[in-house]
Amino acid sequence: MNPPLWQMKKQMAEIGHRIWQKGFCAGNEGNHSVRISEDRVLCTPTGISKGFLDADDMCIVDMDGNQVEPNPKGRKRTSEVLVHLAIYKKRPDVKAVIHSHPPHATAFAIAQIPLPEGIHPEAEVFLGKVRTAPYATPSKQALPDSILPLIGPETNTVLMANHGSVSFSFDLTDTYYKLEILDAYCRVLLLTKQLGSVNQLDKGQMTELLEVKKQFGLPDERLSCSKEGCVGSENQPFLASFPVNPTTASCDCNGGEASTSTESFEAMVQAITNQIVDSMGK
């Protein structure tokens, strides 16, 4: 049984505040929804920051996207509600959807580098395999059409090329967790690449992890082939990224090549020190 409608509206606003505070949406970006009955969905309005939402901002639509009840503030439903409705229709078990632009995950979507597998246990258990849908224009039918082929019975998150992400689950809180875990994982991946090598779980480690996941009541189709090494088969684009070494912090400041020598660094420090001393004496 669903909680009272007013409580669901309040939770929608609270989740919006969390999304905004985490920096997952700027301006009036993003949208989220909750399925409140077989043919009704509660969704965020268009044209408002998720950080400014309150319960009276929420809109109610039918499964065709028509706004079926007047909003007390005159708000109109999000223009991207078609994505939400398509997911609800394909997956009746899904009760909440969040579309957002988490920066680290969106960077992967823009670079169109598949999220690597077999690296971080929490990502494997709570996200599983995350695929990237081809680019489609926001607010058009092409957007849900691009996502639906990637949604299987175990899918809970999809990246949208050059756009953002969409997460979905059995309730709004768990859907938010999926979003938060996604961006945290992508941030860790980017930090790891800056350090250098990436350690991947081997076949045995990955199989054992997926068996634990199954014990948690979270089935994963990859368990059937993990012993053969199917996990991580698309990791190469990520592992091969960052082919150019970062530039060093010191240079001659005249367009010359960067230098890492101790002498050059000490000379630069001395020059700056001399300038500071001279300025203090004036």
Where are these regions (language model features)?
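Glycine-rich flexible loops
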Residues: 1-282
